[in-house]
Amino acid sequence: MSLRICVGGATGWTGKALVAGIVAAPDLSLSGAVARKAAGQDAGIVAGLDVLGIGVAASVEQALSAEPTDVYIDYTHPSAVKANVLKALEMGVPAVVGTSGLAAAEYEEIAKFAEKQGLGVVASGNFSITASLLTRFSLLAAQHVADYEIIDYAKSTKPDVPSGTARELAERMGAIQKSVPGYPIKDIIGPHEARGADVGGGRVHAVRLPSYVLAVEAIFGKDGERLTIRHDAGTSAGPYVAGTLLAARRVVALKGLVRGLDNLLFGTLPA
């Protein structure tokens, strides 16, 4: 039997590509779609496909009540994702979270509720396989180099700062060891904002300009040497679809929260 998936944010860039990817996969089927502004329309038409006979719902509760669903995937908006995922878990459906912008405290709340429900959640700021390698390499580097900063690049219209990729990376690197500025931020002469934001114990700088899709750069420095690890995303949603659907296939066997596609692929990094 195919894995039945409901997509939240079905009218978005990744959401449309996910609908197409699910329809094309022999082991998956689309059970529902959520997009408030497109409610009532056919999910296939919204995604640029032929008619699928599946209506777009206005809410997660409406979509999951309409058809049996094995996995809920969320690519909605930072303001909606936590409530969406908690609702899915409440209704007995594990979740995959690709929406960026959640804070560490929100992930903690989701993790606790997932454990309580005995269900799995996989959340990643970036579901690209190569981005997960950036994360893993950077976490390994953070174990050995205490001085680091992150630069986050995205299009000028991206609403959340930093991106989910950069935020997740900074928080996870900070959990290994925090990067203490060589000169105290409070004593800086000039605008303190020029040194970036403190995210998870490290400095993060966000660049928002036309021509960028998404790029993240982790820079590590020691006396006399420097290491730069960088990932650049292209204009195709394909890499995110592949990683998201990989997570959807695996989340049904999990309990609790797995944060970061790298942990799903390579296992938890030893302390």
Say what each PLM segment does.
Residues C6-G8, W13-A66, A146-A271:
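C-terminal substrate-binding/catalytic lobe of Rossmann-fold NAD(P)-dependent oxidoreductases
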Residues S31, A57, V96, G120-V122:
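Structural detector of well-ordered beta-strand residues that form the stable sheet scaffold
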Residues S132-V145, V161:
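Rossmann-like NAD(P)H-binding beta-loop-alpha module
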